[in-house]
A protein has these predicted regions:
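Hydrophobic packing within well-folded, soluble alpha/beta domains
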Residues: 21, 25, 42, 53, ...
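Short hydrophobic/aromatic patch on the recognition helix
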Residues: 47-57
């Protein structure tokens, strides 16, 4: 189990923000990948001494898992906020897909998705990482399925397909955009594909 701030031993107070340190580590791993990130890379990015690093995190793998969990939690929360931002379920789903297009184009697109990059680098072969990535996609599918079902109940979305099947298709398309962004796909192309998806599915 990962340690939390409340589980820390009593003693000298920590002189850095644990959550901010994990977020800095996430940026380092995101840019370099797990295997190409060295301890000096992490210490520089997190602005920690070696002693503080080992006391707080134990090892490189531990901080990587915490960074990946932070990333997946952020991603789910951001999608949830977009899906709740419009009273129309159909419009909310399109807004979420447009957000994926924004993240998948330009410099953000070339940088890629930390979750997708991690899956490509580390899987198969690491059950802990597989579980985090699998739970990310499941949580995203749950959010989209609930929004689709709401749209079906309101008559905005066709009832001819199961909401979870549609949600799986949406998430697959969204992650595909993240991959295409790595090779420089244009935002206008992605928006045309989103319009086609909306026309076919809804």
């Amino acid at each position: 189990m990962m340690a939390t701030n409340s589980q820390l031993p009593v003693g000298r107070p920590r002189e850095f923000d644990l959550d901010e340190a994990i977020r800095c580590a996430m940026q380092v791993f995101w840019d370099r990948g797990y295997h190409d990130t060295s301890l000096p890379d992490l210490l520089a990015g997190m602005k920690l001494s070696k002693g503080s690093f080992y006391k707080a995190f134990g090892d490189k793998r531990s901080v990587f898992l915490r960074a990946l969990k932070l990333y997946t939690d952020d991603g789910v929360r951001n999608v949830q906020e977009v899906l709740r931002s419009d009273p129309s379920p159909r419009a909310a789903i399109r807004n979420a897909l447009v957000r994926y297009a924004d993240l998948s184009s330009g410099s953000k697109g070339v940088r890629g998705c930390f979750g997708v990059l991690t899956a490509a680098e580390m899987l198969p072969g690491d059950p802990d990482i597989a579980d985090l990535i699998k739970r990310l996609f499941t949580r995203l599918q749950d959010l989209f399925a609930a929004t689709v079902a709401k749209g079906q109940a309101a008559g905005e979305i066709k009832n001819s397909r199961d909401a979870r099947v549609i949600a799986h298709f949406i998430v697959s398309h969204a992650q595909g955009m993240r991959v295409l962004g790595k090779v420089g796909s244009r935002r206008d192309e992605m928006l045309k594909n989103i319009d086609l998806l909306m026309e076919i599915v809804f």
